[in-house]
């Protein structure tokens, strides 16, 4: 049902034109909005509800300001036509959406999500790391296995002619190294591969000097030390190094093929005492 039409405002005494009244004499018909039956039919239910709320609010403001006047026919019609503002008169589009939600097309997420249990405040416990053995016991399925920490290459890895990749060299274990160094020093426990190295090492503990100099009789622990020591017994006029020892007379490194051994201070202490 369409709302009542706008009332015709009769001219009052002193007005030149209808509707042109003096300031301060405002009625509800001056500020209200009226629709024709054709215009009212084009409005949606939501727009009609908004129109009702605005008109009732405007009428309430005028009453609060103390403007006199009878109750407008539009407000009376809004109060009588309660069916036009019932929940059944809804927007068709909104009604379809709400109907779809009622049918279960769009589930409610709040209903599906479980409620969170409030956690007790306190220090968090650190996660306990379990060993692979415990994980294997909990998972008896043979398909679920724990991978080893380090992938080991196959023992008999052959050379691949297609890619040309060489098999990785095996890393000797501690047991293999201990098996190679079978000669152990009884004094310090150090191990050696060859017995000659063990014999030379034991002279450090015993203080034995089995290599004497044939010219002066000075004894040394190693044979190459005797050969280096014999340089000081050479004549000062014959040898290539038979000059006064100094910076230029002694090379920094021995030359390959040189018969003279490397010169060390511990091999010729007497020369520095005699000639400086």
From Swiss-Prot:
Domain of life: Eukaryota
Compositional bias ranges of the Basic and acidic residues kind: 91-119, 127-140
GO cellular component, one term: nucleus
Keyword S-adenosyl-L-methionine assigned: no
Domain KRAB: 26-97
Name of the protein in its database record: Zinc finger protein 688
Gene: ZNF688
InterPro entries: KRAB (IPR001909), KRAB_dom_sf (IPR036051), Krueppel_C2H2_ZnF (IPR050169), Znf_C2H2_sf (IPR036236), Znf_C2H2_type (IPR013087)
Keywords of the record: DNA-binding, Metal-binding, Nucleus, Repeat, Transcription, Transcription regulation, Zinc, Zinc-finger
Listed Pro residues bias regions: 1-10
Disordered: annotated span: 1-22, 80-170, 236-255
Similarity-based family: Belongs to the krueppel C2H2-type zinc-finger protein family.
UniProt subcellular location: Nucleus
Annotated zinc fingers (C2H2-type), start-end: 183-205, 211-233
A GO molecular-function descriptor: zinc ion binding
Pfam families: KRAB, zf-C2H2
Species name: Homo sapiens (Human)
Function text: May be involved in transcriptional regulation.
